[in-house]
Curated annotation (Swiss-Prot):
Post-translational modification: Contains an active site 4-methylidene-imidazol-5-one (MIO), which is formed autocatalytically by cyclization and dehydration of residues Ala-Ser-Gly.
Gene for this chain: Hal
The enzyme's E.C. designation: 4.3.1.3
GO cellular component assignments: cytoplasm
Family label: Belongs to the PAL/histidase family.
Name under which the protein is recorded: Histidine ammonia-lyase
Cross-link (5-imidazolinone (Ala-Gly)): 253-255
Xref: Pfam families: Lyase_aromatic, Par3_HAL_N_term
Domain of life: Eukaryota
Cited CDD domains: PAL-HAL
GO molecular function terms listed in the Swiss-Prot or TrEMBL record: histidine ammonia-lyase activity
Length: 657
């Protein structure tokens, strides 16, 4: 029998339909009738017949014709909205749809699985789980560990042992023993009371990451959750039913209690949930629409679901992956700028970096050589100024290996900490099945990821700081020898004048965001939890800084490509021409002023999707396989015996040099 979930005046109603030949109008009237039946005053209506309404899908908000047959117009379990005409309690939008969160009109249920064991999840895996590319299953070893852990909890309950969080209250109430008949109520109360976050909800991608990471940590078998409950949580994830999780409210110890409580609240059928099928609705209806039942918590299971650093760490995973992507592409963008400004490649000589062998510095210098080596990739632009009188470039060009390099090393350091945290048990108390006991500790404290993500923000910010200075050099005619602000008919046109201001504003804002949040701490829970990490803010502001970096580099990418226009018909190296072609596939050259924000967004999207890296990476890797490490690429300003031999009829003897 088909069934539909209908929203009427803020209420969600499940309406079964025995006959698919019934109409959309019948569904609307039946929903209104059920709404009136549940209200003492019939909702203010005298009869269903007097109610005039429209019906539309929650997904996409498409209006339906009241005469259409249900079996034709709707799918089983679809969510619809009844909009009552002229009714102030029935606005022309869905009240439960939070700002900034939209339905996935193109969502496709994944077919592939990732097997979680609590020990081997990577940052890349978690980001892909967040994007909905995979479903989850447990390894057989993980299932066994979870079962063994639960047996310890069951034994504690049976023997009526006093153990924190299982038979006692929480925090300041740790010495309050709870009667056996109240242990399940204790867990539900915990989830409800701790669901006290504020702010906008996490996006579906971030909520999916949060849920997947909590599943991975529970799969380690140190939290005492039952295998039955954990499998229910996995079913919810695989159906993409996602709780309403406000982004603010965690102090990062004892774990991320508020956001994880909101996550658990939806699992027990309370609060709001979202799915691609339903949009936002009451959690119990979203679960029912996917054939799922609310989880009934057993003793310890509420605590098992909410105690840990998964909010900090899941956002940290996204930050690390996005930082890695933009750091790689920053080298390509800077190389293009160097070409436009007719810089020298001599600063990327292998010997310079061999005597200061930081891993990131060496790799960045190599990438510049692979993109700019005029022996490997002839450049007409480089040849045009081979014998100019320049000796060396400004720091923003010459010192890219040193500045970009430390960013790469910072990301690697942070990624190592975040990866360890991904696969760590962060509950309290911990259940050690091999010892048959629980131990209270402090693994829930978020200081590790908090400090790491503060460091990440500081490190990655420098990519934007140096990029903004390169944008200045591109736009300033006294430095670039190009038209002011990269546009013809300056004065009539302003070109990149304010795009550069935008970059400067983003860099300035990020400087404030780079103030480390983990240096702060406030005592909470009546001084029981008297030192906290503030890691939630560290993670959120790291993501904001990284977004600013992406946007600044998007502006530099556009500016560099526009600079190329004024050097035509000369060509740059083959890999950089491919980058130019990529940008021109989404943004045309500026002949005169036009609305610039969409172009910045288009370039930002190329960087987010790693398209710039995709077109350049094959050339970088080919160069890696073919180049001779000791070789030194000829530069427009290189001065060496070899260059003299190639370019001069008279070569001085070595004794005369």
């Amino acid at each position: 029998m088909p069934r539909y979930t209908v929203h009427v005046r803020g209420e969600w109603l499940a309406v079964p339909c025995q006959d698919g030949k019934l109409s959309v109008g019948w569904l609307g009237r039946e929903a209104v009738r059920r709404y009136m039946k549940n209200k003492p005053d019939n909702g203010g209506f005298t009869s269903v017949d007097e109610v005039r309404f429209l019906v539309r899908r929650c997904k996409g908000l498409g209006l339906l014709d009241n005469e259409d047959l249900l079996e034709v117009a709707l799918e089983d379990n679809e969510f619809v909205e009844v909009v009552i005409e002229g009714d102030v309690m029935s606005p022309d939008f869905i009240p439960s749809q939070p700002e900034g969160v939209f339905l996935y009109s193109k969502y496709r249920e994944p077919e592939k699985y990732i097997a979680l064991d609590g020990d081997s999840l990577s940052t890349e895996d978690l980001v892909n789980l967040g994007k909905g590319h995979y479903k989850i299953k447990l390894t057989s070893i993980a299932e066994k560990k979870v079962q063994q852990s639960r047996e310890v909890i069951d034994s504690i309950i049976k023997e009526r042992t006093v153990v924190y969080g299982i038979t006692t209250g929480f925090g300041k109430f740790a010495r309050t023993v709870i009667p056996a008949n109240k242990l399940q109520e204790l867990q539900v109360n915990l989830v409800r009371s701790h669901s006290s976050g504020v702010g906008k909800p996490l996006s579906p991608e971030r909520c999916r990451m949060l849920l997947a990471l909590r599943i991975n940590v529970l799969a380690k078998g140190y939290s005492g959750i039952s295998l039955e409950t954990l499998k229910q949580v996995i079913e919810v994830f695989n159906a993409s039913c996602l709780s309403y999780v406000p982004e603010k409210g965690t102090v990062g110890a004892s774990g991320d209690l508020a956001p994880l409580s909101h996550l658990a609240l939806g699992l027990i059928g309370e609060g709001k949930m979202w799915s691609p099928k339903s949009g936002w609705a009451d959690a119990k209806y979203v679960l029912e629409a996917h054939g799922l039942k609310p989880i009934v918590l057993k003793p310890k299971e509420g605590l098992a679901l909410i105690n840990g650093t998964q909010m900090i760490t899941s956002l940290g995973c996204e930050a690390v992956e996005r930082a890695s992507a933009i750091a790689r592409q920053a080298d390509i963008v800077a190389a293009l700028t160097l070409e436009v400004l007719k810089g020298t490649t001599k600063a990327f000589d292998t010997d310079i970096h061999a005597v200061r062998p930081h891993r990131g510095q060496i790799e960045v210098a190599f990438r510049f050589r692979s993109l700019l080596d005029s022996d490997h990739h002839p450049s007409e632009i480089a040849e045009s100024h081979r014998f100019c009188d320049r000796v060396q470039d400004a720091y923003t060009l010459r010192c890219c290996p040193q500045v970009h390099g430390v960013v790469n090393d910072t990301i690697a350091f942070v990624k190592d900490i975040i990866t360890t945290e991904l696969n760590s048990a962060t509950d309290n108390p911990m259940v050690f099945a091999s010892r048959g006991e629980t131990i209270s500790g402090g693994n829930f404290h978020g200081e590790y990821p908090a400090k790491a993500l503060d460091y990440l923000a500081i490190g990655v910010h420098e990519l934007a700081a140096i990029s903004e200075r390169r944008i200045e050099r591109l736009c300033n005619p006294s430095l670039s020898e190009l038209p002011a602000f990269l546009v013809a008919e300056g004065g009539l046109n302003s070109g990149f004048m304010i795009a550069h201001c935008t970059a400067a504003a983003l860099v300035s804002e990020s400087k404030a965001l780079c103030h480390p949040s983990s240096v702060d701490s406030l005592s909470t829970s009546a001084a029981t939890e008297d030192h906290v990490s503030m890691g939630g803010w560290a993670a959120r502001k790291a993501l904001r800084v990284i977004e600013h970096v992406e946007q600044v580099l998007a502006i530099e990418l556009l500016a560099a490509c526009q600079g190329i226009e004024f050097l035509r018909p000369l060509k740059t190296t083959t890999p950089l021409e491919k980058v130019y072609d990529l940008v021109r596939s989404v943004v045309r050259p500026w002949i005169k002023d036009r609305f610039m924000a969409p172009d910045i967004e288009a370039a930002h999207r190329l960087l987010l999707d790693q398209k710039v890296w995709e077109v350049a990476a094959p050339y970088i890797e080919k160069y890696r396989m073919e180049h001779i490490p000791e070789s030194r690429p000829l530069s427009p300003t290189a001065f060496s015996l070899e260059s003299l031999r190639k370019n001069s009829a008279t070569i001085p003897e070595s004794d005369d040099l």
